[in-house]
Amino acid sequence: KSTLMNLLGCLDTPTRGRYLLEGVDVADYRDDELAEIRATRLGFVFQSFNLLPRATVLRNVVLPLIYTACPRKERELRAHAALRSVSLDERLYDHRSNELSGGQMQRVAIARALVNDPALILADEPTGNLDTATGDMVLNTFKRLRDAGKTIVLITHEPDVAAHADRVVHIRDGRLYEGAHGGEGARP
């Protein structure tokens, strides 16, 4: 799982085969170009949220834009748009992230992943630290994003979470399989 996420997130390059992101083999990029891709074309959502606890919601979402050439005024506009897309109450934008519930923190993390309008969103166990109702709310957020045309790779060990996906791929013994839980009848 970690190797797959590192490859998809352009943190590593394959030793065999090719990984095309937006039609280009990532092995053709220099390290500085890969860093730019990670900052602008990929969105990361983590199980543990990875928010700055004493920073406001808005500051946490703006953070990725600071590392790009995005003008200061546009940063806040884009952060507000990303937060609206995950249905977070505007009254929470000035709250510190450590004052939020788990579901609210995960929606802030998703908004942060969206703020650069990424080609690909990588979500590693995004419901793992949440209760069922809050997890369903996060999955509904991903469904809305998918319906809006976003590509999402969601890693999970939970079959009920995987059931929300349009396509399910299993990892078994280091190989990827589509369908049938990587067992009998699965296709590599």
Kindly give the residue locations of the regions a language model identified.
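Short coil-to-helix segment of the ABC ATPase nucleotide-binding domain corresponding to the Q-loop/switch region
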Residues: 55-63
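Conserved catalytic motifs of ABC-family nucleotide-binding domains
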Residues: 117
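Helix-to-loop junction immediately C-terminal to a conserved catalytic motif
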Residues: 9
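Conserved ABC ATPase signature
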Residues: 96-100, 104-105
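Conserved ABC ATPase "signature" region
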Residues: 24-25, 73-91
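Conserved ABC transporter NBD signature motif
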Residues: 17-25
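Catalytic Walker B motif of ABC-type/P-loop ATPase nucleotide-binding domains
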Residues: 121-124
